[in-house]
Amino acid sequence: MQTIYTKITDIKGNLITVEAEGARLGELATITRSDGRSSYASVLRFDLKKVTLQVFGGTSGLSTGDHVTFLGRPMEVTFGSSLLGRRLNGIGKPIDNEGECFGEPIEIATPTFNPVCRIVPRSMVRTNIPMIDVFNCLVKSQKIPIFSSSGEHHNALLMRIAAQTDADIVVIGGMGLTFVDYSFFVEESKKLGFADKCVMFIHKAVDAPVECVLVPDMALACAEKFAVEEKKNVLVLLTDMTAFADALKEISITMDQIPANRGYPGSLYSDLALRYEKAVEIADGGSITLITVTTMPSDDITHPVPDNTGYITEGQFYLRNNRIDPFGSLSRLKQLVIGKVTREDHGDLANALIRLYADSRKATERMAMGFKLSNWDKKLLAFSELFETRLMSLEVNIPLEEALDIGWKILAQSFTSEEVGIKAQLINKYWPKACLSK
């Protein structure tokens, strides 16, 4: 029998303190107001008989005499095939006017997958984006963020990746979204044709911070079930992890916790790692590939959120000036697939293209400062223009093999075969015969 408590001793922000016994961290409770309305709350901490709870939806209209009932279980989300094509909020309730979701209730925020059952990833996730496929391959089960400067179209990039990969299921977790962002996700998933294999967990900017914290846990709990029980390859997209961290900061400040760097809680690294470590490829099972967006306030890479994220993840895509910056981006798992599941020329060609593009940036600086340009500088500048137009632009949408062929053509149009620094065996096989050496 559940005990009802009515001694709410303190209400501060979205937190309440109630005198109760037997509560557990993370336990779910219901609060019934005097007018009959009810809402959920979650136990954040307890001190003897004083239990502090975070109220979902805020404490507006709450009084000290309202009823608090502990449910004896943590937060859960409904899991099942009926989730596909649905949109839910931060507490797992449908927001798409399509009725209730039916299925099995599962716990969220469970421990990460047993490392013994993990396997070393060997498969490439194709995106048809040359700056990813050619230079920083996305590997199945990889955890990787998109570091985005302000004003960049990171949501459009996420949706494009979701539409063009071969994932069986796409799980999207949106945190701190404006109505415009939310509408964009809904419309683009329908327009690009993957809405039926997608489930969205959405926290809007006007919703309670605790719902923001729950969104990645719900998204990852469902993804893990799909991967383990149904052996599906799941792509999880989370945006924006900076909003997630800001929600953690707001909650910790309300709880009077001692702040760490720039006001964020000292547990920020662990809180981020707990979510990122859900990425996994399972032996004789499915996989979870995790791509997130981390916006950088004032384009500051040393901000605590991107700074901590870089120590956890397996690389990053740096989105700047509506391009994936090749110098700030990195995939630490690309060596597992380049030349093994891709063409033999992949690694050498990518290295040559990036090396020459780096040299072209120096030539651009010399031109801007008014120095006299050499013939080599002029070749580099011509190469740079072709490279940025035909490979770097996010408008380019081509398979990996075609991107590699274009890379060879760009080199042949700008340099002689002796100038590119690629071994003769590959030059003889892949150098375009139709392009005359200059």
Curated annotation (Swiss-Prot):
GO terms classed as biological process: proton motive force-driven plasma membrane ATP synthesis
Claim: Transport is one of the keywords in the record: yes
Single Gene Ontology MF annotation: ATP binding
Family matches, as SUPFAM superfamilies: P-loop containing nucleoside triphosphate hydrolases
Residue ranges the record marks as coiled coil: none
UniProt keywords, alphabetically: ATP synthesis, Hydrogen ion transport, Ion transport, Transport
Homology family: Belongs to the ATPase alpha/beta chains family.
Function comment: Produces ATP from ADP in the presence of a proton gradient across the membrane. The V-type beta chain is a regulatory subunit.
Protein name as annotated: V-type ATP synthase beta chain
Taxonomic source organism: Chlamydia pneumoniae (Chlamydophila pneumoniae)
